Amino acid sequence: MSSLPVAAVLPELLTALDCAPQVLLSAPTGAGKSTWLPLQLLAHPGINGKIILLEPRRLAARNVAQRLAELLNEKPGDTVGYRMRAQNCVGPNTRLEVVTEGVLTRMIQRDPELSGVGLVILDEFHERSLQADLALALLLDVQQGLRDDLKLLIMSATLDNDRLQQMLPEAPVVISEGRSFPVERRYLPLPAHQRFDDAVAVATAEMLRQESGSLLLFLPGVGEIQRVQEQLASRIGSDVLLCPLYGALSLNDQRKAILPAPQGMRKVVLATNIAETSLTIEGIRLVVDCAQERVARFDPRTGLTRLITQRVSQASMTQRAGRAGRLEPGISLHLIAKEQAERAAAQSEPEILQSDLSGLLMELLQWGCSDPAQMSWLDQPPVVNLLAAKRLLQMLGALEGERLSAQGQKMAALGNDPRLAAMLVSAKNDDEAATAAKIAAILEEPPRMGNSDLGVAFSRNQPAWQQRSQQLLKRLNVRGGEADSSLIAPLLAGAFADRIARRRGQDGRYQLANGMGAMLDANDALSRHEWLIAPLLLQGSASPDARILLALLVDIDELVQRCPQLVQQSDTVEWDDAQGTLKAWRRLQIGQLTVKVQPLAKPSEDELHQAMLNGIRDKGLSVLNWTAEAEQLRLRLLCAAKWLPEYDWPAVDDESLLAALETWLLPHMTGVHSLRGLKSLDIYQALRGLLDWGMQQRLDSELPAHYTVPTGSRIAIRYHEDNPPALAVRMQEMFGEATNPTIAQGRVPLVLELLSPAQRPLQITRDLSDFWKGAYREVQKEMKGRYPKHVWPDDPANTAPTRRTKKYS
């Protein structure tokens, strides 16, 4: 094994790891970086603690762990183990854990210091999956703030060194030349007049006739794999096995595809891009590359993912071709013109730029980061995708302002997709928990093709679903409980309320509660039902309507009875074009779907406004335009009543405001004739109208919205209902302030969140004088080294404040 190419750079790599917290390793496929190097690092005395090896794909993780254990003459679970969703194989003596991406994130969240871990290896980092980017950001944060002794090795076959070196300029780069046999690369564009499946099958069969050895065929997705397999079956001899390989196959079926062909047989492995890098497939010397891939692109406008078939990057073509030269000289046939291949993008677009970021945002909030820009990213998450993620988390009740709510914290602790996590934590008893766990297991690994009825899938006892649901129940700390199909609809409705659907035609078309269209095959048995919940949707490429992949038929009356919180009641006035008059209607709605309509007598202006006020009372104050300024004014009034009770402050709790809408809101509703118009109202001014001029002055004086710090900066005070008021300010701007600022006639000290020059929290205190005299010394010592260009005086209480560095002070 020491003849492996990566062995030649082992001394250089070990020296780099001894000297630097992060090291970059570029080593082509087959160099031994996954299946040999980790054991050498395990034996290195400079690595103190366990090694965590991240593999992006489950099959690769298990295979790598199996191979590493074999080299030690052991089984997985001894020195080498693995962890992945629904499968753990580790023991008390395990020192090297091979894990998949989500598992690593959970490990970091549960133990931010990664206690007992000396080295984390990110393998196949060039794939730039969303979870790998998140893991890198979290690990760099851990190194910076908690574990400066933790080592990080980032390795890949086609490492984007330029980008990584810009982000990690001090990280040594170790390059292994690798070892591969020459691969003859041929190009053959597919005939325009021939069906894709037929043309690929013909080209593959011809390659098998001309050349010896087994063949790896790259296709965009499962549909193409199944169709090309069918076409190939009639074009090849009995000595050729056809083996599909894609992510949704069971691990056992995937393993069959990578094992050697039986004696005297050849095989064709029909694979998606799962086979590009991390898997060793025995006996391959021929590659046929269709030069296409299917990628998921998230649409933040609809909240849905669209599958796009596109040309692969040049890096992917190189990787695919390289599979033919792992064991002997090989041939790679790219089904594309050479000129087109040369015009392809150099690298694939990272997932973080085109994915649903709701899970990432929830992970960051659990980490304590409300602003993703504070983390280190190779590519910043798109703002529009983050806003869509925030909207979803708000809908699921996971947010409280800019932080996770109590429910959001429970959701984040599970590590599931946010919708599934919301469903799981909503379970009120063991039976509901068992039902939610089984639904989550099905939606995580849905049945491929076939029946779209979730109820039918729920009735099946598929082992993988059973195993996964048991794992989820363990996380929920639930023992016992029976999965009950009658509980599916209300559980789904809580997490997928926007995907409740009502039929709008006889051809399988539906409207969703969020206003979007969706479609079932007209021959699907579910399409006969008026109401569905469709948790699994895919944005169509040829139609604006989403495609329903999995749905549950619903008795809407029963659902409304069991989940009254889903229904909004609104009184509206509409023109009746036929009569030329106004008519009033009371609608019971779920989102944009009307459940029931009842006519009302023609209202007067006063009746219209009263109906609107009733609508506000039914829906709650959230239908109003609560700007941050209005929210803070309300909190100031709530706090004033507690801190200065001797004055007659108006009550502004929900119940009181709803009861007094006629007093404070109605005077501002002139000309407002719709619920939409309510959104244009200035709630800040409406609330200030509750105070006379004298009380307004008292509020602004005693509980000001801003505090002027010694530098003259006016900084917003953050008021909270149950916590002291807080002021986040850079420490240098508070120099010269000897005592802690107070408000409310000196009764309430401000909580000072003293920030570093980079706006990171350094200290939280309610006693500034005590801090200057005590804990400041430790902060000063650390910050002088980290921010030498900034002022860190010995006597901050008597030093002039500044916003600037020493150069300008």
From Swiss-Prot:
<keyword id="KW-0547">Nucleotide-binding</keyword>
<dbReference type="GO" id="GO:0005524">
    <property type="term" value="F:ATP binding"/>
</dbReference>
<keyword id="KW-0067">ATP-binding</keyword>
<dbReference type="GO" id="GO:0017111">
    <property type="term" value="F:ribonucleoside triphosphate phosphatase activity"/>
</dbReference>
<dbReference type="Pfam" id="PF00271">
    <property type="entry name" value="Helicase_C"/>
</dbReference>
<protein>
    <recommendedName>
        <fullName>ATP-dependent RNA helicase HrpB</fullName>
        <ecNumber>3.6.4.13</ecNumber>
    </recommendedName>
</protein>
<dbReference type="GO" id="GO:0016887">
    <property type="term" value="F:ATP hydrolysis activity"/>
</dbReference>
<dbReference type="GO" id="GO:0003724">
    <property type="term" value="F:RNA helicase activity"/>
</dbReference>
<dbReference type="GO" id="GO:0003727">
    <property type="term" value="F:single-stranded RNA binding"/>
</dbReference>
<feature type="domain" description="Helicase ATP-binding">
    <location>
        <begin position="14"/>
        <end position="177"/>
    </location>
</feature>
<dbReference type="InterPro" id="IPR027417">
    <property type="entry name" value="P-loop_NTPase"/>
</dbReference>
<feature type="binding site">
    <location>
        <begin position="27"/>
        <end position="34"/>
    </location>
    <ligand>
        <name>ATP</name>
    </ligand>
</feature>
<dbReference type="InterPro" id="IPR014001">
    <property type="entry name" value="Helicase_ATP-bd"/>
</dbReference>
<dbReference type="Pfam" id="PF24473">
    <property type="entry name" value="CON_HrpB"/>
</dbReference>
<comment type="similarity">
    <text>Belongs to the DEAD box helicase family.</text>
</comment>
<dbReference type="InterPro" id="IPR049614">
    <property type="entry name" value="HrpB_DEXH"/>
</dbReference>
<keyword id="KW-0347">Helicase</keyword>
<keyword id="KW-0378">Hydrolase</keyword>
<feature type="region of interest" description="Disordered">
    <location>
        <begin position="788"/>
        <end position="809"/>
    </location>
</feature>
<dbReference type="InterPro" id="IPR056329">
    <property type="entry name" value="CON_HrpB"/>
</dbReference>
<feature type="domain" description="Helicase C-terminal">
    <location>
        <begin position="195"/>
        <end position="368"/>
    </location>
</feature>
<dbReference type="InterPro" id="IPR011545">
    <property type="entry name" value="DEAD/DEAH_box_helicase_dom"/>
</dbReference>
<dbReference type="Pfam" id="PF08482">
    <property type="entry name" value="HrpB_C"/>
</dbReference>
<feature type="short sequence motif" description="DEFH box">
    <location>
        <begin position="123"/>
        <end position="126"/>
    </location>
</feature>
<dbReference type="InterPro" id="IPR013689">
    <property type="entry name" value="RNA_helicase_ATP-dep_HrpB_C"/>
</dbReference>
<dbReference type="Pfam" id="PF00270">
    <property type="entry name" value="DEAD"/>
</dbReference>
<dbReference type="InterPro" id="IPR001650">
    <property type="entry name" value="Helicase_C-like"/>
</dbReference>
<dbReference type="InterPro" id="IPR010225">
    <property type="entry name" value="HrpB"/>
</dbReference>
<dbReference type="InterPro" id="IPR007502">
    <property type="entry name" value="Helicase-assoc_dom"/>
</dbReference>
